[in-house]
């Protein structure tokens, strides 16, 4: 689980994280991860992780015993939780720490989701940051970013258009344009 999501040099750290993760799933779901996978290119390799993970959250006391790299790995993994509150909790933790390049795909993937509060958290954390690293990642994954932008737009149209009728002011669009560096050249 999540083997292809992290660089090979993090194998030991990933194993340590797996040991503290519960085996119990939400509502005793018979699967721990979805079959749908997310793929991005990073550092000349394909990173792949499940769209959703159904494992229960861990206790904060367990989180506290992990080292910084292990915490970052755990935060990345739990951004794929089926529970939006859990995704937001670990996203906040991830954005509050200095994160490595390999964490960027997990942050970027959350930018096209339907939970407005998560999009607002990302925008508010990234808007005043130098996002050159994230923008470079997005520019190297243009096909995936075009799909993500379309998905974000679709969610705005379906769920948030009545609240924010001007798409130019919608936080999801501002996130993609201002923080992720998305522009029309991605579509060519």
Show where each model-derived region lies.
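Extended repeat-based scaffolds of very large eukaryotic assembly and lipid-transport proteins
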Residues: 1-89, 129-131, 135-188
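Buried hydrophobic core positions in alpha-solenoid tandem helical repeats
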Residues: 74-76, 104-108
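Short coil turns that connect the paired helices of HEAT/ARM alpha-solenoid repeats
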Residues: 79-82, 112-117
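Helix-boundary capping/turn motifs
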Residues: 82, 95-100
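Conserved hydrophobic register position within alpha-solenoid helical repeats
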Residues: 90-93, 118-123
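Residue-level signature of the C-terminal ends
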Residues: 93-97, 125, 129
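Alpha-solenoid repeat scaffolds
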Residues: 100-101, 117, 132-133
């Amino acid at each position: 689980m999540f083997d292809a999501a992290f660089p090979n040099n993090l194998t030991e750290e990933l194993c340590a994280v797996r040991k503290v993760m519960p085996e119990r799933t939400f509502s005793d779901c018979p699967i721990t991860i979805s079959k749908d996978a997310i793929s991005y290119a990073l550092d000349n390799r394909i990173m792949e992780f499940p769209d959703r993970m159904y494992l229960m959250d861990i206790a904060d006391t367990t989180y506290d015993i992990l080292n910084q790299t292990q915490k970052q790995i755990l935060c990345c993994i739990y951004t794929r939780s089926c529970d939006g509150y859990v995704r937001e909790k670990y996203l906040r933790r991830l954005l509050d720490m200095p994160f490595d390049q390999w964490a960027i795909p997990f942050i970027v993937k959350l930018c096209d989701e339907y939970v407005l509060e998560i999009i607002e958290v990302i925008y508010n954390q990234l808007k005043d940051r130098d996002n050159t690293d994230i923008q470079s990642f997005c520019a190297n994954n243009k096909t995936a970013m075009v799909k993500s932008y379309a998905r974000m737009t679709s969610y705005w149209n379906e769920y948030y258009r009545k609240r924010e009728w001007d798409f130019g002011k919608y936080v999801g669009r501002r996130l993609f344009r201002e923080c992720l560096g998305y522009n029309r050249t991605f579509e060519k």
